[in-house]
C-alpha cells in the first residue's frame, strides 16, 4: 500500500504566478494561488507547484555552470503544432536539439522542458 498519493513537483522561480500561468495554459490545468506558492492541478489531482526564490538563477543547460534543477517532458501528438503553441505562451526554443523525437525549450524562468512524441 502506498504511503502517499499524487506527488507534487515543486519548481523554484522568480515569479510563481507567471510560471504557473505558463504551465497551466500548456497543460490546460487550473491555477490555484496558495499563501506561499502557486499550484497548477489537473482534474484527476496531479499537481505542479511553483515557489518564489529571491536570488533565483536559471539553469544553463546543457553545461553545468548553473546545473539543471529539473525538467519536464510533455508528450504531444504533433511537434510542430506544439512548438508553435508553447512559443506563443512565452517559451524559447533551445539552440541545442540533441534528438529527433523531442524538442527542447526553456520556460519563461529558464527551466528546460521537452515536447516529446509518444
Which stretches of residues belong to each language-model region?
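Core segments of cupin and vicinal oxygen chelate
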Residues: 3, 7-53, 81-104
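A short, acidic/glycine-rich surface segment
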Residues: 55-61
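Short, acidic, Ser/Thr-enriched surface-loop or helix-capping motifs
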Residues: 107
